[in-house]
């Protein structure tokens, strides 16, 4: 895409972090923006912040775990603005109690929650928006937020979900090319970013609550403490948003806002696979 002024962007997980930064960047480029998030009060604050940039803003409370919420979001976006040109499937959760825990001990409630938001939320976003975007016949772009965790070696629902988003996005890009569509796609794989993703437990639905959270959290404490410190030292969300905007503008698929050592680890893993070395 080369023209952004007056076009429409939809961003999920838009009340904070990377999502809010992307929404602000799109507004700076003259776009109308649809903000979606599960948290009502932060969403209202984000709406005011983005409105101050100029352009029209629509805020929709939506839970990316719920297929019906995602289709309702698409309905609201198309009914309000007539079309959507950029869709950012960005909302995600970390499932902090599952970090540092052997994969066979992670309860299904964690898998259902993390995979439901991080992977199925992206898939439902594609299903809800892409057919309508294709039918409009205009230039557009899908941006799916994965993680460097989606390019590395690890276990647990977060890493598995992000690997899924990478592969889904690669397939989406190839599908668009094969049909000669005016749509394209990018996958964003950030390293450590200064966000509040580790606090996502507050949004876990009651039916997927953990009864053993205190016990598991203690086992994962050191892992989470290290992760929290890394997040604090991470790059600002605005830098991720800058790279995302440039990727949409330049039709670049892989967006890697991460330090060189993280990118090098991806190459090392790929070389290990080709050499048939065991994971490390």
Each language-model region and where it sits:
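Active-site helix of classical SDR
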Residues: 126, 161-164
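The beta1-alpha1 cofactor-binding region of Rossmann-like NAD(H)/NADP(H)-dependent oxidoreductases
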Residues: 40-41, 61-72, 108
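SDR active-site lid
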Residues: 177-255
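Residue(s) in the substrate-gating loop at a strand-loop-helix junction
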Residues: 147
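A short, exposed helix-loop element centered on a Lys and neighboring polar residues
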Residues: 126-127, 170
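Substrate-binding pocket helix/loop in short-chain dehydrogenase/reductase
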Residues: 98-103, 107-112
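Canonical Rossmann dinucleotide-binding motif of NAD(H)/NADP(H)-dependent dehydrogenases/reductases
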Residues: 2-34
């Amino acid at each position: 895409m080369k023209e952004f002024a007056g076009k429409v962007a939809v961003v999920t997980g838009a009340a904070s972090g990377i999502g809010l930064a992307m929404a602000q960047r799109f507004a700076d480029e003259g776009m109308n923006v649809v903000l979606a998030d599960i948290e009502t009060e932060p969403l209202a604050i984000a709406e005011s912040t983005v409105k101050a940039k100029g352009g029209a803003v629509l805020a929709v409370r939506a839970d990316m775990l719920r297929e019906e919420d995602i289709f309702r979001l698409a309905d609201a976006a198309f009914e309000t603005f007539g079309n959507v040109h950029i869709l950012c499937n960005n909302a995600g959760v970390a499932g902090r109690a599952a970090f540092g825990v052997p994969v066979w001990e992670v309860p299904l409630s964690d898998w259902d929650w993390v995979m439901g938001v991080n992977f199925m939320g992206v898939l439902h976003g594609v299903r809800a928006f892409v057919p309508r975007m294709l039918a409009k016949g205009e230039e557009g772009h899908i941006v799916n937020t994965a993680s460097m965790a989606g390019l590395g070696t690890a276990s647990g629902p977060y890493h598995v979900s992000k690997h899924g988003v990478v592969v889904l996005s690669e397939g989406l890009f190839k599908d668009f090319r094969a049909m000669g569509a005016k749509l394209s796609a990018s996958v964003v794989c950030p390293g450590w970013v200064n966000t509040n993703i580790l606090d996502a437990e507050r949004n876990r639905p009651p039916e997927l609550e953990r009864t053993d959270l205190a016990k598991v959290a203690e086992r994962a404490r050191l892992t989470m403490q290290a992760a929290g410190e890394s997040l604090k030292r991470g790059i600002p969300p605005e830098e991720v948003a800058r790279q995302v905007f440039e990727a949409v503008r330049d039709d670049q698929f892989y967006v890697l806002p991460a330090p060189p050592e993280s990118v090098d680890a991806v190459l090392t893993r790929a070389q290990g696979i080709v050499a048939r070395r065991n994971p490390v």
